[in-house]
UniProtKB/Swiss-Prot annotation:
This is Glutathione S-transferase F6. Glutathione binds at residues 12-13, 41-42, 54-55, 67-68. GO terms for molecular function: camalexin binding; cobalt ion binding; copper ion binding; glutathione binding; glutathione transferase activity; quercitrin binding. It comes from Arabidopsis thaliana (Mouse-ear cress). It catalyses: RX + glutathione = an S-substituted glutathione + a halide anion + H(+). InterPro entries: Glutathione-S-Trfase_C-like, Glutathione-S-Trfase_C_sf, Glutathione_S-Trfase_N, GST_C, GST_Phi_C, Thioredoxin-like_sf. The keyword Aminoacyl-tRNA synthetase does not apply. Induction: By dehydration stress, salicylic acid, ethylene, methyl jasmonate, auxin, H(2)O(2), copper, metolachlor, and the pathogens P.syringae and Hyaloperonospora parasitica. Induced by cadmium. Involved in camalexin biosynthesis by probably catalyzing the conjugation of GSH with indole-3-acetonitrile (IAN). May be involved in the conjugation of reduced glutathione to a wide number of exogenous and endogenous hydrophobic electrophiles and have a detoxification role against certain herbicides. The lineage of its organism: Eukaryota, Viridiplantae, Streptophyta, Embryophyta, Tracheophyta. Coiled coil: none annotated.
Length: 208
């Protein structure tokens, strides 16, 4: 039976999300590079794996799936007996589900815009829009205020142990720590300690 394959780009935050999950679970996999600058993600054969033309795509033998958060949840459930537990049970699982929604709808869209403006645009020879950065930082600050309160109650966002909720934030945070937006994390003591914790995990270091 064929093993696990991840089709993506190493700089993609969504791809990194999946790779971190696999490293957390100590699961072997094959990484298949999809070159975004050549538009490979919009052509066959990749488009057959994800018709929306976005990385990553994932295969576990005959099982195929896309969308990074769906993939990480599959990994966490399918390999629950391996590596670190990224889930919980009962009411705590509902807290994890809520946290995943908050990260997906509140944290990631804003964080990704800030990564685009401050990291990716300069790489492409484009100019950072400072007005957009200011607007998005104001939005991110509100999300981080919620996180700061939550982290004052528990070590991690959904539990006293590291879960998918924390994992999903890592790729965007890794990029933002190299930008002036880092100040928003540093200004909040609980958030700052949490960021230092999750970004220093071996799984996170492996995707840099």
């Amino acid at each position: 039976m064929a093993g696990i394959k991840v089709f993506g780009h190493p700089a993609s935050t969504a791809t990194r999300r999946v790779l971190i999950a696999l490293h957390e679970k100590n699961v072997d996999f094959e990484f298949v590079h999809v070159e975004l600058k050549d538009g490979e993600h919009k052509k066959e054969p990749f488009i057959l794996r994800n018709p929306f033309g976005k990385v990553p795509a994932f295969e576990d033998g005959d099982f195929k799936i896309f969308e990074s958060r769906a993939i990480t949840q599959y990994i966490a459930h399918e390999f629950s007996d391996k590596g670190n537990n990224l889930l919980s049970t009962g009411k705590d699982m509902a807290i994890i589900a809520m946290g995943i929604e908050i990260e997906s709808h509140e944290f990631d869209p804003v964080g990704s815009k800030l990564v685009w403006e401050q990291v990716l645009k300069p790489l492409y020879g484009m100019t950072t829009d400072k007005t957009v950065v200011e607007e998005e930082e104001a939005k991110l600050a509100k999300v981080l205020d919620v996180y700061e309160h939550r982290l004052g109650e528990s070590k991690y966002l959904a539990s006293d142990h590291f879960t998918l909720v924390d994992l999903h934030t890592i790729p965007v945070i890794q990029y933002l720590l190299g930008t002036p937006t880092k100040k928003l994390f540093d200004e909040r003591p609980h958030v700052s300690a949490w960021v230092a914790d999750i970004t220093s995990r071996p799984s996170a270091q492996k995707v840099l």
